[in-house]
Amino acid sequence: MKKLKIIIDILLFIITIALFNIGLIGNLMHEILGIALAILIIIHILLNFKLIKQVTKNFKKTNTKTKIMYIIDILIMIIYLGTIICGILIANEVFNFHMSSSLGLVLTHLILGRLAIITMFIHLGLHLDRIFKKVKNEKFKKAIYIIYIFIVIGITVYFIYTLTHSFQWLYAFENSNW
């Protein structure tokens, strides 16, 4: 069971990152991976349901870090759910609801997609102590944490840059009455 959880977590990470670059993987693969991501999220929640139920039941009694992690996990779930719903609605390969030209849905999908990745990195950061539990060398552990922080900051800055410089924003403002 533990190995399955780790495999699911790794797949969630890889697919989330792969979904970011639609130009590289194409629309069809983006939609297929989005569906796979939704399925993996459901499996991830089911595999961790006992823990989720326990923390929910004892929320007031849990420590601050667990409360923060729990709130972030709920936020991640809401963000991913919004991303997936918008993605399905604007899809034009696997599904076709003829809404792919809905600028509001496209922008919501883009924003939530980036927020999903950022919150995923926060989630991973809060779990790094569990991930590196077996690492005995403190200097190596500290170096990994520092590298992780720089990677997260770099990716976050890149996502903000690409979001603010993407063609969707230009299109939105060109066609608005503002």
Regions found by a protein language model. Give the residues of each.
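Membrane-embedded alpha-helical bundles that constitute the cytochrome b-like, heme-associated redox core
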Residues: M1-W178
